């Protein structure tokens, strides 16, 4: 009997919220930047908007990572799309969408 392991077919490393330290977490910029660093898998958190559309957000409220207030579940996706999810991180990402 052999105990040889089969090669692991899945990514060994997962980028947490994209490249969340280098770009605003859970944004397209964070995922693109993570991909340029060789990541093939990303961990993210999804929430539902008031009108039932999924969007990416870790926190229970909008304040830490956007210019919004309250919870995303109280807003329509159209309202969420207007939020700035980048300015909290750096000027380079000002205006970044969720």
Segments from the language model and where they lie:
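Short acidic, Gly/Ser-rich segments with clustered Asp/Glu that frequently serve as metal-coordination loops
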Residues: 42-55
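Conserved, mostly hydrophobic/aromatic
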Residues: 16, 34, 45, 80
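Structural motif
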Residues: 33, 37-39
């Amino acid at each position: 009997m052999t105990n040889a392991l089969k090669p692991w077919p899945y990514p060994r490393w997962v980028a947490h919220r994209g490249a969340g330290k280098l770009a605003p977490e859970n944004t397209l910029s964070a995922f693109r930047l993570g991909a340029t660093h060789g990541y093939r898998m990303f961990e993210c958190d999804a929430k539902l908007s008031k009108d039932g559309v999924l969007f990416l957000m870790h926190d229970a409220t909008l304040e830490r990572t956007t210019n919004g207030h309250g919870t995303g579940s109280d807003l329509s996706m159209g309202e969420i799309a207007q939020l700035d999810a980048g300015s909290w991180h750096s000027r380079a990402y000002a205006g970044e969408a969720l």
